[in-house]
């Protein structure tokens, strides 16, 4: 999904970054800038080390989506379905008009919870990507 939907030289965000792998991939696929945050202090250093090991520059810090004052062309969020639904408004606020977001880490049976939030915030569903019992949703912010 990163390779397919992220514009070249995109400004990208990885929300709930964990190990930082999605942000690191975005950087390797040509993002000009990658910001990643997580609310778990223990993962920040791990993510920074992973970026270093992969020779990419990413800004990783302790933060939450509601406190970020930047806009991004491409947003990645691999978080539990209920958290995705709860913070969908904050995630939308991070997106530039026409920007894409990949919502992943969703169990198939929990997909309706996330889709309801996508509809509630008027995001356009572009594609569903399935892998076994997991689903990723690609959405776009329409002006």
Description of each model-found segment:
Residues 1-68:
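Conserved SAM/SAH cofactor-binding pocket of Class I
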Residues 106-121:
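Short alpha-helix
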Residues 12, 75-77:
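Hydrophobic beta-strand segment of the Class I
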Residues 124-143:
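Core SAM-dependent methyltransferase catalytic element
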Residues 5, 93-95, 104, 121:
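Conserved helix-to-beta-strand junction in the class I
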Residues 85-100:
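A short glycine-rich, Lys/Arg-flanked "PGG" loop and its adjoining helix->strand segment in the class I
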Residues 42-46, 83, 110:
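Conserved short alpha-helix immediately C-terminal to the canonical SAM/SAH-binding motif I
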Residues 79, 103-108:
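Short strand-turn motif at the edge of the Rossmann-like AdoMet-binding core
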């Amino acid at each position: 999904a990163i390779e397919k939907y992220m514009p070249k030289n995109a400004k990208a965000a990885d929300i709930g970054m964990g190990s930082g792998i999605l942000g690191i991939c975005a950087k390797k696929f040509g993002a000009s800038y990658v910001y990643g945050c997580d609310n778990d202090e223990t993962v920040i250093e791990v993510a920074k080390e992973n970026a270093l090991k992969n020779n990419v520059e990413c800004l990783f810090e302790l933060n939450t989506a509601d406190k970020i004052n930047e806009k991004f062309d491409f947003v990645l969020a691999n978080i539990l379905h209920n958290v995705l639904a709860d913070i969908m408004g904050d995630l939308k606020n991070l997106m530039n008009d026409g920007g894409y977001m990949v919502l992943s880490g969703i169990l198939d049976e929990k997909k309706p919870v996330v889709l309801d939030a996508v509809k509630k915030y008027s995001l356009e569903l572009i594609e569903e990507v399935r892998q076994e019992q997991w689903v990723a949703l690609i959405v776009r912010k329409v002006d």
